[in-house]
């Protein structure tokens, strides 16, 4: 089974690909989808969407796991990350694979 894990962000969206069976797990790939600070926000969201689609097409995950948002201080940042997370969830949903959400704790 191949699992794609996502740590949402709008500047950097982290990902990890793990292959697992009933006994062993192995890291296949990890990294970030990076957006340019100088780009308009809609273009940054598009870059995240296309990057997610590329990961999904390349690794064909069986399941996709998202870290839930955990913010207490900066409302603006939470809204921007929430938008990026929504775009990533949309990209994942389009591949018709099960989506799971986990807290960062």
Predicted regions located by residue number:
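Phosphate- and other anionic-substrate recognition elements at nucleic-acid/protein interfaces
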Residues: 1-105
């Amino acid at each position: 089974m191949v699992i794609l894990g996502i740590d949402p962000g709008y500047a950097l969206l982290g990902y990890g690909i793990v292959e697992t069976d009933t006994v062993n797990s192995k890291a296949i790939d990890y990294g970030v989808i990076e957006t340019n600070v100088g780009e308009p926000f809609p273009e940054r969201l598009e870059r995240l969407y296309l990057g997610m689609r590329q990961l999904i097409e390349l690794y064909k995950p069986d399941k996709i796991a998202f870290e839930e948002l955990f913010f207490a201080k900066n409302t603006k940042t939470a809204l921007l990350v929430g938008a990026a997370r929504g775009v990533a969830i949309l990209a994942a949903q389009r591949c018709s694979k099960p989506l799971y959400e986990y807290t960062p704790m």
